[in-house]
């Protein structure tokens, strides 16, 4: 069951990263990845649709996945988005005051990797 959860978590994370970074991908990478991750098509179905080998689809999806993780590791856009959402929730629910909010917001914006 743990393997299934890890696979599901990885798929969900890839889907989120794809939404953030998809404009940095080629058209083919976007097409194959969207069909595989978001539309849940199999490698064979994608290969048939584009008249290419299943291996070519697998290679593209694998490279795209690695690229998405690499982009997040370098740019941290998903992580920053999560921090900003958390900050907004805290200010809306009065868990922090304006001064704390602004200080934390500056830290997120000027965050050094």
Curated annotation (Swiss-Prot):
A Pfam family of this chain: UPF0122
Gene3D superfamilies in the cross-refs: Winged helix-like DNA-binding domain superfamily/Winged helix DNA-binding domain
Known function: Might take part in the signal recognition particle (SRP) pathway. This is inferred from the conservation of its genetic proximity to ftsY/ffh. May be a regulatory protein.
Annotated family: Belongs to the UPF0122 family.
PANTHER family, A to Z: UPF0122 PROTEIN CBO2450/CLC_2298, UPF0122 PROTEIN YLXM
Protein name per UniProt: UPF0122 protein MCAP_0480
